[in-house]
A protein has these predicted regions:
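Local beta-strand N-terminus motif with an aromatic residue
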Residues: 91-92
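Short catalytic micro-motifs in class I SAM-dependent methyltransferases
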Residues: 98-103, 133
Length: 269
């Protein structure tokens, strides 16, 4: 949450830019009396307002004390880790939006297990676990060419590649071509493109984050919880608003990959 602390206005603006697409994913589950937990919520006033307008009861959980304080000052129902450990409230919907990749990027295996168990223990029988996150195609065979728009963009891209490889986010299936572009597997290209667009100011933080969530969802949710959870649907979205940001770095006519994956699970009754 360093971004929030250092530049509150920019942080909230960024959160609000994606609020409508974030809300659309869970809108059909919401009605009067439904309790929804925004797990790893951050601060998104527009999203909170949309939830309130649906008649559902909004609860937020975030590990940042700064975020907790800000949310409480807004009158939001803030849930603590202690509340979740003690199962103070049972939820009809638990929503992880752009959070699961952080769980698999930063938490130890033991912490991941404990976190997922905590989520499951606070989900009502028949309730829904909704995971909205990156959509890396996880394809290590198909190749794509990535061409930077300038020498500066090329240098920044190469800096990201170096750090992503150092942090084991991408492998060596990435080759420099004579024109300054690179050829990379779809899995690597996804990481390179969507990391580079953050800019070098975010290098130290974002270069540690894994955007390939498919394997993580299978390993940490589907396999260990197969007797308690049923995967209802998986679908993908492409956010075209990424294009102008990507075009600052790469020669692209369209967003080359789907940007979000949505996994919807239902807990057995």
């Amino acid at each position: 949450m360093e971004n929030y602390s250092s530049n509150k206005d920019t942080y909230i603006k960024r959160m609000n830019q994606t609020a409508k697409s974030k809300f659309a994913v869970v809108e059909s589950f919401l009605s009067k009396g439904i309790k929804i937990l925004d797990f790893g919520s951050g601060i998104s006033p527009e999203f909170i307002s949309d939830i309130d307008s649906s008649g559902a009861e909004y609860y937020a959980y975030d590990i940042s004390k700064t975020v907790q304080t800000e949310l409480a000052s807004m009158g939001v129902n803030v849930v603590t880790k202690e509340d979740l450990t003690n199962k103070e409230v049972q939820f009809d919907v638990i929503y992880l939006s752009s959070v699961f990749h952080e769980i698999i990027s930063y938490l130890s295996p033991q912490e991941r297990t404990e976190t997922i168990a905590m989520i499951m223990n606070n989900l009502k029988p028949g309730g829904y676990l909704v995971i909205r996150d990156w959509a890396n195609p996880n394809d290590n065979f198909l190749q794509i060419k990535i061409k930077p728009v300038s020498k500066q963009a090329e240098r920044e891209m190469n800096t990201w590649i170096k750090e992503l490889q150092r942090n084991s986010i991408i492998d060596q299936n990435c080759y420099k071509l004579v024109d300054g572009s690179i050829s990379a597997s779809y899995a690597n290209a996804y990481e390179i493109i969507f990391h580079t667009v953050w800019g070098l100011k975010s290098l130290s933080r974002e270069s540690k984050e894994q955007y390939n969530v498919e394997n993580g969802i299978k390993k940490w949710i589907i396999n260990p919880w197969e007797k308690e959870l049923n995967l209802q649907t998986v679908y993908y979205e492409t956010d075209e608003t990424y294009l102008p940001h990507l075009q600052k770095y790469f020669k692209l006519d369209e967003v080359p990959f789907e940007t979000k994956s949505i996994h919807i699970f239902q807990k057995n009754k």
